[in-house]
Regions:
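Glycine-rich phosphate/diphosphate-binding loop of Rossmann-like nucleotide-binding domains
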Residues: 24-54, 59
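Glycine- and acidic
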Residues: 17-21, 39-45, 67-70, 92-95, ...
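Glycine-rich phosphate/diphosphate-binding loops that line cofactor/substrate pockets in enzymes
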Residues: 5-11, 33-42, 87-89
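Mid-sequence acidic-hydrophobic segments that form the walls
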Residues: 2-5, 150, 178
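Aromatic-enriched
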Residues: 1-31
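Thiamine diphosphate
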Residues: 52-147, 160-178
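The feature captures the short pre-catalytic strand/loop hairpin that immediately precedes
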Residues: 148-154
Length: 178
């Protein structure tokens, strides 16, 4: 009865017009787009340790790889995850590891090793809102600086920073080709 009461007394502020097209629309969040990008890129192996907010990518890929082929490895920690991905890449598989800010910090030594040994690797960092582990006061993009400069020495690498969910999909494919 509350809805009828409100409808009779509260003016409508705005209306959402119906869609003009009846074509199907794919509605995704960023992690789902990343997972689809991993599949579309032909990535054969993903290694990761569960970490918020990246974990749902591994859940999606574990199911998808059973259907399309591929291997999803849940490592015992972040360092083991990148080590596993580097080993798979060294053995000739297309591999990536997925993490978030604190995990990226733990992967830095192995990431520097992969760069210096010229072992191809895609690292997907699902950035948390920050500072810290939440959104208490503001947001920042500190993981970008960590991705660019977090390794010791001169470790040149390509860092792609998607601004949209669509770019989350396309940038995984692009990263696989670089």
């Amino acid at each position: 009865h509350g809805a009828a009461f409100a409808a009779a007394r509260v003016p409508v502020a705005w209306q959402v017009p119906p869609r003009s097209s009846q074509e199907p629309v794919l509605v995704l969040n960023g992690n789902q787009a990343l997972g689809l990008g991993v599949l579309a890129s032909g990535m054969e192996m993903v290694a990761m340790y569960p970490i918020t907010p990246a974990t749902s990518v591994s859940h999606y890929l574990a199911r998808a790889f059973q259907t399309v082929g591929g291997y999803m490895h849940q490592a015992e920690d972040e360092i083991a995850a990148i080590g596993f991905a580097i080993g798979a890449s060294y053995a000739g598989k297309t591999a990536c590891t997925i993490t978030s800010g604190p995990g990226l910090a733990l992967k830095t030594e192995f990431l520097g090793y992969a760069v210096m040994a010229e072992i191809p690797l895609v690292v997907i960092n699902v950035q948390r809102g920050g500072p810290s582990t939440g959104l208490p006061t503001k947001v920042e993009q500190g993981d970008l600086l960590a991705a660019l400069y977090g390794q010791p020495g001169d470790t040149p690498k390509v860092v792609l920073a998607p601004a949209t969910i669509e770019e989350c999909f396309h940038f995984v494919i692009l990263a696989r080709k670089l």
